[in-house]
Each structure stands twice: as structure tokens, then as C-alpha cells.
């Protein structure tokens, strides 16, 4: 927690400096997020450019390949997850950890669409995993030190548990919250 994470740094390195180019970049990222959420990893790049209000050449100037756009979207999600750890850090330990887990559930919802199109061998994927685990680890440790979470729980296990529970199809939102509550409850001391 505290300070800039690697995902944010990588995003800043990718984002153009000129104001008009930065606006186009941001519009493409927002349009890409919408299109991938609606159409999956096979979303049309032409549609993304149209939604962003730019030409296809501008899209390719910013993102030479589909993978480049997907990696940037994934970096944004991971950076937001890391930022969420900082945002909840001042809450009581258990509340902070569980608030971050709620944000992690939101992240899992966008992650599946992006991971379908992401090259899992890329360095970005490996770095993002480290950023994500690094964001949750201090919150977990504080909750463990406070006696709110079992001492033998590891952040990598928590991430797998919550990701698995979040990926299942539920009858309704109430059932999803109940099952997620059971999973989080299983971590408590």
C-alpha cells in the first residue's frame, strides 16, 4: 500500500503526453472497455475506434495490436484494484480487508473478458499478478494480526477462492452475495 504501483507506472508510460493524443488514448480505452464488456475479447477494433470518435489509424497508432489494447485495459483494472487497497487502508483491519475483497469481486467480473484475449505469457500479466497480490497482502496481514482472519491464510489462496466463487453463474444477486459471504466467512478466525 502507499505509493504508486507498477500497473499505474506502466499505464503512464503508455499514455501519450500531448493533450489531444492523451484524450484520444483515454477515449479508446473507455470505448474498448465498453466494447469488450459487451462483445467479449473478439470485439471489433473498428467499432472501438468509432465509439471513441477517432479513426482506425488513431487506434492503431495507440495500440498497434489487439493485445496492446487488452493489456492496457487489464493494467487499468489492476491499477484500480491496487488503488482500492490504499483507499480502504485506514478502515479497521477486518473491514479494510473485506472492502478490498468486494473491489476484487468487481475486478474479477471484468477480468474474465480481458483474460480471454490476453497473452498469459506476457510480462504485463506476470507484473499485474504481483501488483494485485502485493495490494491485498498488507490488508490480509493486518486482519490476521488483529485476529479477524485465520493466521494460516495466504493472499494467493484468498485470490483463488474469491475468483472461483465470483466466476460461478448464480440465480440472482442475493444468492451471489450469500455464497460470497460464506467464502469470506470461511477466512475469519
What kind of feature is each model-predicted range?
Residues 1-42, 46-51, 68:
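Basic, helix-initiating cap at the start of DNA-binding domains
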Residues 116-124:
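Short linear capping/connector segments at secondary-structure termini
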Residues 63, 70-77:
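Alpha-helical DNA-contacting segments of helix-turn-helix folds
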Residues 67-69, 113:
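A secondary-structure capping/hinge motif
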Residues 1-12, 99, 138-148, 164, ...:
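C-terminal peripheral helix-coil segments that are non-catalytic and often amphipathic
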Amino acid at each position: 500500500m502507499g505509493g504508486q504501483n507498477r500497473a499505474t507506472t506502466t499505464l503512464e508510460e503508455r499514455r501519450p503526453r500531448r493533450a489531444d493524443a492523451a484524450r484520444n488514448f483515454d477515449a479508446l480505452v473507455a470505448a474498448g472497455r465498453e466494447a469488450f464488456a459487451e462483445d467479449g475479447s473478439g470485439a471489433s477494433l473498428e467499432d472501438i475506434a468509432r465509439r471513441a470518435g477517432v479513426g482506425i489509424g488513431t487506434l492503431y497508432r495507440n495500440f498497434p495490436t489487439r493485445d496492446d489494447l487488452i493489456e492496457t485495459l487489464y493494467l487499468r483494472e489492476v491499477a484500480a484494484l491496487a488503488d482500492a487497497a490504499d483507499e480502504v487502508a485506514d478502515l479497521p483491519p477486518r473491514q479494510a480487508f473485506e472492502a478490498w475483497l468486494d473491489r476484487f469481486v468487481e475486478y474479477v467480473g471484468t477480468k474474465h473478458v480481458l483474460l480471454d484475449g490476453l497473452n498469459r505469457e506476457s510480462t504485463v500479466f506476470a507484473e499485474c499478478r504481483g501488483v494485485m497480490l502485493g495490494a491485498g497482502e498488507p490488508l490480509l496481514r493486518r486482519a490476521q494480526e488483529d485476529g479477524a482472519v485465520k493466521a494460516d491464510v495466504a493472499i494467493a489462496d484468498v485470490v483463488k477462492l474469491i475468483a472461483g466463487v465470483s466466476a460461478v453463474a448464480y440465480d440472482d444477486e442475493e444468492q451471489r452475495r450469500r455464497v460470497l459471504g460464506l467464502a469470506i466467512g470461511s477466512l475469519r478466525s
